[in-house]
Amino acid sequence: MAKQTPLYDQHVACGARMVDFHGWMMPLHYGSQIDEHHFVRQDAGMFDVSHMTIVDLHGNRTREFLRYLLANDVAKLTQPGKALYTGMLNESGGVIDDLIVYFLSEDYFRLVVNSATRDKDLAWISQHAEPYQVEVTVRDDLALIAVQGPQAQQKVATLLTTEQQQAIAGMKPFFGIQTGDLFIATTGYTGEAGYEIALPKQQVVAFWQQLLAAGVKPAGLGARDTLRLEAGMNLYGQEMDEKTSPLAANMGWTVAWQPEDRQFIGRAALERQRMKGTEQLVGLIMTEKGVLRNELPVYFFDAAGNQHVGVITSGSFSPTLGFSIALARVPAGIGEHAVVQIRNREMPVRVTKPGFVRAGKAIVL
């Protein structure tokens, strides 16, 4: 039977259509996915992301452990609260998961990992933590709400104490701080400003209701997906998985090659892939009528006139732009134009870098 977050009854009360999402009953939408999408882009929406897993790591060798476990380098994290995005790779360079890691103190780091990968993530982390004597604590006592949009931070501030407001004042993107019972982070999955807020489960219903009263509208998985796609953000299981290199998933920037003597899991395989070359993740735009969908083939000719084929990993109508967009994994050598086979029609598409909308504005036109 699918699990429920502490906010399940709140979703039902808000009119949500609930669906099974990787073993969790989650809201797909509350009546209109498009309206929810626009409200996040223009005002402030909130997502229940309590199905995600928060993992706290304690121990004197935690930083050393994470420098081995993760492809990005936590040595970059010198200011308490600072966070970074990274892949956690297997020995063949495939992505076990993508996650955010927060540096809270020298012997205390926090990870936020995906729900669909929870069991394998926890097994992998625990297995490799043991030699470093790092204590792994799964924070199932916490719920998690993402409040996103240009008015999100302003509306959240109305619910905070003076001390909490002062604690987060001027906090830059990709930081997190514990203030009172709230862990408030300037992270998100929409391309908008906002917070991701972890708090004790028994307090989350009241906090949700306060957000509603402050004019923050609930948004479901449908809007979350179109928002992250517009922002060019990966979804685990679509843009990458255990057989996909981060170099083929627009995650090359998350691999810290320096210093050269840092050995992290998957490094040797990645170095071979970097020498050999990999496929690449690109953006696609189709302004003609129709919708780009996952798994549709993408055809193009390289400079020598040879035809190649790739595949759409995520595709949808873009509510902000008013036409269809996609992310696609393609062989190297693609130019500015390609063709997507939709049923029996060959539809022309424009090739871009991943990422179509930032801070509510088109960045591809």
From Swiss-Prot:
Entry-linked Pfam families: GCV_T, GCV_T_C
InterPro entries hit by this protein: GCS_T, GCS_T_bac, GCST_C, GCV_T_N, GcvT/YgfZ/DmdA, GcvT/YgfZ_C, TrmE/GcvT_dom1
Gene Ontology, cellular component aspect: cytosol; glycine cleavage complex
Matching NCBIfam families: gcvT, PRK00389.1
Name of encoding gene: gcvT
Organism: Yersinia pestis
Family: Belongs to the GcvT family.
The keyword Heme appears for this protein: no
Top EC class of this enzyme: transferase
Catalytic activity annotation: N(6)-[(R)-S(8)-aminomethyldihydrolipoyl]-L-lysyl-[protein] + (6S)-5,6,7,8-tetrahydrofolate = N(6)-[(R)-dihydrolipoyl]-L-lysyl-[protein] + (6R)-5,10-methylene-5,6,7,8-tetrahydrofolate + NH4(+)
GO MF annotation terms: aminomethyltransferase activity; transaminase activity
Protein name stated in the entry: Aminomethyltransferase
Enzyme Commission number, as recorded: 2.1.2.10
Entry annotated with the keyword Ribonucleoprotein: no
Classification of source organism: Bacteria, Pseudomonadati, Pseudomonadota, Gammaproteobacteria, Enterobacterales
Function, as annotated: The glycine cleavage system catalyzes the degradation of glycine.
SUPFAM superfamilies: Aminomethyltransferase beta-barrel domain (SSF101790), Folate-binding domain (SSF103025)
Binding partners and assembly: The glycine cleavage system is composed of four proteins: P, T, L and H.
GO biological process: glycine decarboxylation via glycine cleavage system
Top-level lineage group: Bacteria
Gene3D superfamilies: Aminomethyltransferase beta-barrel domains (3.30.70.1400), Aminomethyltransferase fragment (4.10.1250.10), Probable tRNA modification gtpase trme, domain 1 (3.30.1360.120)
Keywords: Aminotransferase, Transferase
